[in-house]
Each structure stands twice: as structure tokens, then as C-alpha cells.
Amino acid sequence: PELRSASDGDVDYSDGVFIVNEDWYGHQNSTVNFLTNQGEWIYRAFQKENPGRELGCTTQFRYNLWQPLLFCVKTGTDPGAKITGSRFAVCDASTMEVIKEFPYIATTTKTDKNGKETLISIADGRSYLPVDEHKGYIGTSNGIYVFDNDNLTIGGANQRYG
């Protein structure tokens, strides 16, 4: 199929349906396809609108009741991928262009025996629940984190329950 993009002036990503694909683990990062209301498929829309960028491995959730689009992802990179993707991505709802990417939702540092510190992820993305147009909750493998939509920041974890 012919590859088109919003920069061509004829794709409005607010007028159709997204299909979020976890993809084939061990081979590549997640992809996002788009079906226009006219029945035309736009394949790999995220990569097409953001050359050189990808979502991470096993995208779990996409939300856009209010502008912008939000993608929540389990891990940053599939073992077979060449690009480290984002774990949480904020995109323009009409153009799909990245506004902000987060390589991690939450981190800690690990120090090896030589004293070298390494930043590691402590929270794999699972879901997103909006509270209103200003705030939402990111569900992770390590608690619930607050996303500030006005400042595009991820805050600390809420107390874990259960």
C-alpha cells in the first residue's frame, strides 16, 4: 500500500480508529496502524510521523479522550529492535507527531562492584486512566504514577494496594 503521512496534508489522525499492535516479541518494537473513516489503512503511523523514533516493546494502551494521544508501553526495547523506544509517549492527536517521550516511567540506580551507577527501570507500563484533562494515572508493574498533562511530567507513585 501507498504510505501517506499527516505531513502530506491528507491524514487527520483524529478522524478514524487506531490499532495498537504489541507486535512480534523478539523481532521488533510495537507498531500503531490507523484506519481512516473512509476505510483507508495507514500502516506504522507512529514511525511514519516520527522518523527514527519508535514506541517500545509491547505497547499496552492508547488513550485520547482529550488532546493529546497517550501511549503506555511495557518495556523500552524489543530484543530484536534496533531503536530504543519510549515507555510513555505523548503525541499530537491530529498529526501523531511526538510532543514528549519518556524512556522510563520510574527509575532507580544500581551500583556495580566498581562503583559505576546505572539507571534502571522499576516500572513497566500497563495502562492509563485519565482523571480529567489535567491529570491521569499510569498503571505499572510497580504501582500507580501520576501524569501531569499540563506540564507533561510523571510524578511519584501512589501507595500500592492489594
Show which residues each predicted segment covers.
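Acidic/polar, low-complexity intrinsically disordered N-terminal segments immediately downstream
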Residues: 1-93, 97
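Surface-exposed, polar helix/loop patches in the mature regions of secreted/periplasmic/lumenal proteins
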Residues: 73-127
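Repeated scaffold domains used in trafficking and secretory/extracellular systems
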Residues: 4-6, 53-63, 107-133, 160-162
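Intrinsically disordered, low-complexity linker/loop segments enriched in Gly/Pro
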Residues: 135-162
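Short beta-strand/turn micro-motifs composed of small residues
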Residues: 21, 125, 140
